[in-house]
């Protein structure tokens, strides 16, 4: 059997971590690099709620070693969970069809565009 098991958590910004695990008074911008020295990966849980912008993602990559991995959780619309239109990237909102309750209906076109955005 071959393969690799990586160990990490679902966030580097969890309030419990901030309070209990990180060094006291460690600035927020230094938490991800500090985390990446101790774990091999992190789950991007925030991507379930809103697609992060490209500059933010590049900043995360730059703050971590080359071998560090990000496990990206797909946006809730792609996993067929209820999603408000404002959780979509602004340029994709006009293509979104909504239910009577203002929730995104995942059309094939939106699914393709949203999936492409996540892997850019």
Locate each region found by the language model:
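Residues lining hydrophobic/aromatic ligand-binding pockets adjacent to catalytic sites
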Residues: 1-120
